[in-house]
């Protein structure tokens, strides 16, 4: 059933085609703005709060106050239509909300079409037909432009002579100035000073023919994420995990850790090696060069050897707390680690389909290995994020809340950041921003990761602190640049307008 046509002030609003029109002029608005205008018309003369607008226009979507404010501003601009004499359509009532200030008339669809068809285009004011012929003649004569006087024409010519003279003089001065500049000045883009404490993690070759490609790629992504998070949390190095970032651009990082999968003949057979190379960009020297043959059970041993080799190459001893953390977050079997990293890779993507798949894989891991409690916690995190985007039914939500209550009390998960990530998202979904803020800051104290800073940005945005939110989002993208992190910023928990909240990041990505 089509929505009825309504006249709001001078504008005829046709919701079925998302158009407003007046005096023969038609404007097409976004569906959300049309819904907002129709809701104002349905409550003409009433003061509507932001919460009422969110509940009735945005319905089940989670939006912030600035989204409502921005939509009201766009609607006001469209209704004004560059008309300085336009009446005030929507007034702001301080500390109350907004109010429609113009009269409203409702029509049926047929009446609205007749009104639109019968509305003539604006025409200039006509001369009355009862005037005398002599009067008409006078009107016609006055409409004829008078001849330009010679004095005015002469002044006009003098003006253009001086204008072109000064323009030519300015061009000559500019050419002389440009010719005197030293054109051999260095380009600023090429002057990048390396930071020896920064490390980039890149992936060169992503697959081998002799090993299942999805497992191979997700294993490398998981190892890279673990190395980046460990160094960022337990050392003074700043690591940028660029495995998901495919832009070839200059970097200021003093070191580069490259992961590649290569086929090489060994003992008359082709084998797939995972090559790990750490290069010091200051002098081009190789600090670490290792190759691993991955089998179905040595994934955990390879990862432990890599961490130990990095510790020696970087002269960075691993603290005891890191050793304890790794014991809690990693399984004790290599084959299980590959399955866990595949589920974790889906979590990194962040979209609905990937989160659903991550929940399924983690559920299988928990069922087959109930002693791996960290997988249970990560499944709870995935499920609460899914609930924030597509609310679960009452039975599913009750089961999830019970599972979360059980997980946060497990002693083997004490002092792990994932517990506070779960608490932060759960509180944020319920609108408890202060509780969420406290939880995610505790999580950041325990672990410096891109996901923690994405969640911190979401909390700041809900608190109306967009400047702090922009800093948090930029930190997250700096730690793990790429499409995955950008998707989390734009769509995780609730939708974020990157051009509005993080304009620098929007311009940076547009320059690619």
Curated annotation (Swiss-Prot):
One of its GO terms (molecular function) is protein homodimerization activity. Homodimer. Dimerization of the periplasmic domain is required for activation of the cadBA operon. Interacts strongly with the lysine permease LysP in the absence of lysine or at low lysine concentrations. Interaction is markedly attenuated under increasing lysine levels. Concomitant pH-dependent protonation of periplasmic amino acids in both proteins dissolves their electrostatic connections resulting in further destabilization of the CadC/LysP interaction. Contains a functionally important disulfide bond, which may provide structural support for the pH-dependent activation via a switch of the sensor between the inactive and active state. Residues 1-154 are cytoplasmic. It is found in: Cell inner membrane. Changing residue 208 to A: Induces cadBA expression at pH 5.8 regardless of the presence of lysine, and at pH 7.6 when lysine is present. Weakens interaction with LysP. This is Transcriptional activator CadC. Disulfide bonds join 208-272. One of its GO terms (biological process) is positive regulation of DNA-templated transcription. Changing residue 50 to A: Strongly affects DNA-binding. Abolishes activation of the cadBA promoter under all tested conditions. Changing residue 263 to K: Confers both pH- and lysine-independent cadBA expression. Changing residue 198 to A/E/N: Abolishes response to the external low pH signal. Changing residue 461 to A/D/Q/R: Abolishes response to the external low pH signal. It is a single-pass membrane protein. Changing residue 477 to A: Does not alter pH sensing. Changing residue 477 to I: Is almost pH-insensitive. Decreases inhibition by cadaverine.
């Amino acid at each position: 059933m089509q929505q009825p046509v309504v006249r709001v002030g001078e504008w005829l609003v046709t919701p079925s085609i998302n158009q407003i029109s007046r005096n023969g002029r038609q404007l097409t608005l976004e569906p959300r703005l049309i819904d907002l205008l129709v809701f104002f018309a349905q409550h003409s003369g009433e003061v509507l709060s932001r919460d009422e607008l969110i509940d009735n226009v945005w319905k089940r979507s989670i939006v912030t106050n600035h989204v409502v404010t921005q939509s009201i501003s766009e609607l006001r601009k469209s209704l004004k239509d560059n008309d300085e004499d336009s009446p005030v359509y929507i007034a702001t009532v301080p500390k109350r909300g907004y109010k429609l200030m113009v009269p409203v008339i409702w029509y049926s669809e047929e009446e609205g079409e007749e009104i639109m068809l019968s509305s003539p285009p604006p025409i200039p004011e006509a001369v009355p037909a009862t005037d005398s012929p002599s009067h008409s003649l006078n009107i016609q004569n006055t409409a004829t432009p008078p001849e330009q006087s010679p004095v005015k024409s002469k002044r006009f010519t003098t003006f253009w002579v001086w204008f072109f003279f000064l323009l030519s003089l300015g061009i000559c001065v500019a050419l002389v100035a440009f010719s005197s500049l030293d054109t051999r000045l260095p380009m600023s883009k090429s002057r990048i000073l390396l930071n020896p404490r920064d490390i980039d993690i890149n992936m060169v070759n992503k697959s081998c023919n002799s090993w299942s490609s999805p497992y191979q790629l997700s294993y490398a992504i998981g190892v890279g994420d673990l190395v980046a998070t460990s160094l960022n949390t337990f050392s003074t190095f700043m690591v940028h995990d660029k495995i998901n970032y495919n832009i070839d651009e200059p970097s200021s990082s003093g070191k580069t850790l490259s992961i590649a999968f290569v086929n090489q003949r060994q003992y008359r057979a082709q084998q797939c090696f995972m090559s790990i190379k750490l290069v010091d960009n200051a002098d081009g020297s190789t600090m670490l060069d290792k190759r691993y043959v991955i089998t179905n059970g040595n994934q955990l041993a390879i990862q432990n050897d890599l961490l130990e080799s990095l510790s020696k190459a970087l002269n960075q001893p691993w603290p005891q707390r890191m050793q304890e953390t790794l014991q809690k977050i990693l399984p004790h079997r290599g084959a299980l680690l590959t399955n866990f990293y595949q589920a974790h890779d889906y979590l990194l993507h962040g979209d609905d389909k990937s989160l659903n798949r991550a929940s399924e894989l983690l559920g299988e891991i928990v069922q087959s290995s109930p002693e791996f409690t960290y997988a249970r916690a990560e499944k709870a995190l995935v499920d609460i994020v899914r609930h924030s985007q597509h609310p679960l039914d009452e039975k599913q939500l009750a089961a999830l809340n019970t599972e979360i209550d059980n997980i946060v009390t497990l002693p083997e998960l004490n002092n792990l950041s994932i517990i506070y990530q779960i608490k932060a998202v759960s509180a944020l979904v319920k609108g408890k921003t202060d509780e969420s803020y406290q939880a995610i800051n505790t999580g950041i104290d325990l672990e410096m990761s891109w996901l923690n800073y994405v969640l911190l940005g979401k909390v700041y945005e809900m608190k109306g602190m967009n400047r702090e939110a922009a800093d948090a989002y930029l930190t997250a993208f700096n730690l793990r640049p790429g499409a995955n992190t950008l998707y989390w910023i734009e769509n995780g928990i609730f939708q974020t307008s990157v051009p509005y909240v993080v304009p620098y990041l929007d311009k940076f990505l547009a320059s690619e």
